[in-house]
């Protein structure tokens, strides 16, 4: 039986990992063994943070809506409750955008929420 030499396969695998580790600091971008660990860890962080990003953006939107609602004399929870009672269905992403870029429209939404609560 012929001897199987795997130099080509190993070289390709190493090149692939080192390409993924491009831009990393020091040995992490040059030494295969270290680069492999760095790439694996980076993948774990990326996987985790893709899920965290959704939570963090929702937190940001809620903080912005709360700040804008309080400037108009209403807490976040009462504002959201008022919108639901007024059957206004705008998601938090759009509400936060309106709160930042169109203060007049947001004030009108707060007034509708207040009237629905009363």
Swiss-Prot record:
UniProt keyword terms in alphabetical order? Ribonucleoprotein, Ribosomal protein, RNA-binding, rRNA-binding
Which GO molecular function annotation, any one, does this entry have? Answer: structural constituent of ribosome
Indicate whether Cytoplasm appears among the record's keywords: no
Establish whether keyword RNA-binding is in the entry: yes
Q: Which domain of life is it from?
A: Bacteria
Q: What does this protein do?
A: Binds directly to 23S ribosomal RNA and is necessary for the in vitro assembly process of the 50S ribosomal subunit. It is not involved in the protein synthesizing functions of that subunit.
Q: What is this protein called?
A: Large ribosomal subunit protein bL20
Which source organism? Photorhabdus laumondii subsp. laumondii (strain DSM 15139 / CIP 105565 / TT01)
**Gene name of the encoded protein:** rplT
